[in-house]
């Protein structure tokens, strides 16, 4: 019997997959527990529509990420930090501080965990910080570190 999985079933199939399974297993376990539905023409059409909708949503996410990337390339974020003698920073500028400055200065909200800055910024001046906006889209934020 052909079924369409509505949820992931370990060792059998993933959500949205169409598979041929034994009739008893399909009726007594998969369909009964709402893990799958029978692969009728109506259900197949519904699955196709869901896949198209999901693809359109995914494309919209990618387009939004690309728009944000182009916006980030045009702006500059200014972060102030305490410095000692010789222009050395006390501590470092973290991704949290950059995210907060981006939110207050340009009203753009980006999760600090999406920024790739493992060591932080330890010097005054300009730094390009890579940001993972989406699985496929990566941008950079230009950060200007100034004295407090």
UniProtKB/Swiss-Prot annotation:
Position of the signal peptide: none
Keywords: Ribonucleoprotein, Ribosomal protein, RNA-binding, rRNA-binding
Presence of keyword Chaperone: no
GO BP terms, alphabetized: translation
InterPro entries, sorted: Ribosomal_bL9 (IPR000244), Ribosomal_bL9/RNase_H1_N (IPR009027), Ribosomal_bL9_bac/chp (IPR020594), Ribosomal_bL9_C (IPR020069), Ribosomal_bL9_C_sf (IPR036791), Ribosomal_bL9_N (IPR020070), Ribosomal_bL9_N_sf (IPR036935)
SUPFAM superfamilies referenced in this protein's UniProt entry, alphabetically: L9 N-domain-like (SSF55658), Ribosomal protein L9 C-domain (SSF55653)
PROSITE patterns xrefs: RIBOSOMAL_L9
Gene Ontology cellular component list: ribonucleoprotein complex; ribosome
GO MF annotation terms: rRNA binding; structural constituent of ribosome
One Pfam family from the record: Ribosomal_L9_N
Family annotation (HAMAP family): Ribosomal_bL9
PANTHER family tied to this protein: 50S RIBOSOMAL PROTEIN L9
UniProt function note: Binds to the 23S rRNA.
UniProt family annotation: Belongs to the bacterial ribosomal protein bL9 family.
Protein name stated in the entry: Large ribosomal subunit protein bL9
Lineage: Bacteria, Bacillati, Bacillota, Bacilli, Bacillales
Gene (name only): rplI
């Amino acid at each position: 019997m052909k079924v369409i999985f509505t949820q992931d079933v370990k060792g059998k199939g993933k959500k949205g997959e169409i598979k041929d399974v034994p009739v008893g297993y399909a009726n007594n376990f998969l369909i009964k527990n709402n893990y799958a539905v029978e692969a009728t023409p109506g259900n197949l059409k519904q699955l196709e529509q869901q896949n198209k909708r999901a693809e359109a949503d995914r494309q919209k996410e990618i387009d939004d990420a690309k728009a944000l990337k182009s916006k980030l390339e045009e702006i500059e974020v200014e972060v102030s930090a305490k410095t000692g003698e010789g222009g050395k920073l006390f501590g470092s500028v973290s991704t949290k501080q950059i995210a907060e400055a981006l939110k207050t200065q340009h009203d753009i909200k980006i999760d600090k965990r999406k920024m790739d800055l493992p060591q932080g910024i330890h010097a005054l001046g300009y730094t390009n910080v890579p940001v993972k906006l989406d699985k496929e889209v990566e941008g950079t934020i230009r950060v200007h570190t100034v004295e407090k």
